[in-house]
Amino acid sequence: MTKIVEIVNETRLLRAQGVTAPAGFQAAGITAGIKVSGAPDLALVFNEGPDYAAAGVFTRNKVKAAPVLWTQRVLSTGQLRAVILNSGGANACTGPAGFQDAHTTAEAVAAALSDWGTETGAIEVAVCSTGLIGDRLPMDKVLAGVRAIVHKMAGGVTGGDDAAHAIMTTDTVPKQVALHNRNKWTVGGMAKGAGMLAPSLATMLCVLTTDAVVEPAALDQALRRATAHTFDRLDIDGCCSTNDTVLLLASGASGITPPQADLDDAVRHACDDLCAQLQADAEGVTKRVTVTVIGAASDDDALVAARMIARDNLVKTAVFGSDPNWGRVLAAVGMAPVALDPDRLCMSFNGAAVCIDGVGTPCARDVDLSTADIDITVDLRIGDSAATIRTTDLSHTYVEENSAYSS
């Protein structure tokens, strides 16, 4: 469903468009046979220029997948012309052979684009993978798919939509966004991720595009500021992937250089909306939960406390059962390594006070948590800092999906 809202500077936000909404980009998504299911599994995003500036942020997991290592290396130039993404296999924990597979994939994309008429080098190609950890990719199918996908590229809605479908794993719907600035420049994006969503980006692949004229350093600033307040604050299950990658490419096709503040704002809004879509489609989700800690001594304390609550399985199962068990929330925040006074803690569910000065209110057990959106707010009453984490409940379906993922 198309979603249009008005945000800062009269920018239009639409979910029916994605990476090809900005001028200068084409994309495609095809079935290469990587997935046993026969679902689409190979995507390509191509920057037609005239500029090729790029930036990226990656998982902080020490066990990094081969495509992450490859893409970190090529991004040292601050330039990208293409991103090739596969679902159906993570190419993680595959050793030197897996890294060579990523390199070979980039070379194949460069060769196919060059044959298509756009001279491209492997060092200009980012590689992203998602799926089961520990197995090498079927390179015969990957390389055949690379040769085919170049001829399927399209601009407009079609190419971006096909690409967004092709990167899905346990996702049930594609995630896309486009922000059209009134000053005639655009930011678009697509993301995937439904499980292993935790900070250090969440488990996800995300490609963002813009037709603004932007230097790599400015892109890097915008992306890092955005991810720190969006993807890094989406925490579904506390598990951090080996493959997390967020890339931002700029074509310069609009001819417009926006102020840094406007670029920062647009990228953050795009990331924030994609985060909301990822949260809504998380594995086994029945409740979308927002955990906010206010009154903390510092921003770091607020973030740590909110994350402690969001990751607590007893809190998450209580939310799943629509049980207003506020004691579990206080028990969780009490374990956070932050400054707090238990006799000053206040808390609410969906705006209804359930705890004041560390003691439950008379109607605390009567709060209705049967709605799909749950807001948990804890006031430490120590300082002025605040932070919010997005999470979900913990359902039977989540356990079932993740107990048989590799079988």
From Swiss-Prot:
Might you give the EC number(s) for this enzyme? 2.3.1.35, 2.3.1.1
- This protein's UniProt keywords: Acyltransferase, Amino-acid biosynthesis, Arginine biosynthesis, Autocatalytic cleavage, Cytoplasm, Multifunctional enzyme, Transferase
Pathway field of the UniProt record reads:
Amino-acid biosynthesis; L-arginine biosynthesis; L-ornithine and N-acetyl-L-glutamate from L-glutamate and N(2)-acetyl-L-ornithine (cyclic): step 1/1; Amino-acid biosynthesis; L-arginine biosynthesis; N(2)-acetyl-L-ornithine from L-glutamate: step 1/4
Q: Which amino acid positions bind substrate, per UniProt?
A: 169, 192, 203, 283, 402, 407
Q: Which GO terms describe its biological process?
A: L-arginine biosynthetic process; ornithine biosynthetic process
Catalytic site residues?
203
Q: Where in this chain does the entry annotate a coiled-coil region?
A: none
Subcellular location(s): the record lists:
Cytoplasm
Which leading EC class covers this enzyme?
Answer: transferase
Instruction: Name the GO cellular-component terms.
Output: cytoplasm
Q: What does this protein do?
A: Catalyzes two activities which are involved in the cyclic version of arginine biosynthesis: the synthesis of N-acetylglutamate from glutamate and acetyl-CoA as the acetyl donor, and of ornithine by transacetylation between N(2)-acetylornithine and glutamate.
Question: Record's family?
Answer: Belongs to the ArgJ family.
PANTHER family given for it? ARGININE BIOSYNTHESIS BIFUNCTIONAL PROTEIN ARGJ (PTHR23100), ARGININE BIOSYNTHESIS BIFUNCTIONAL PROTEIN ARGJ, MITOCHONDRIAL (PTHR23100:SF0)
- Know the name of this protein? Arginine biosynthesis bifunctional protein ArgJ
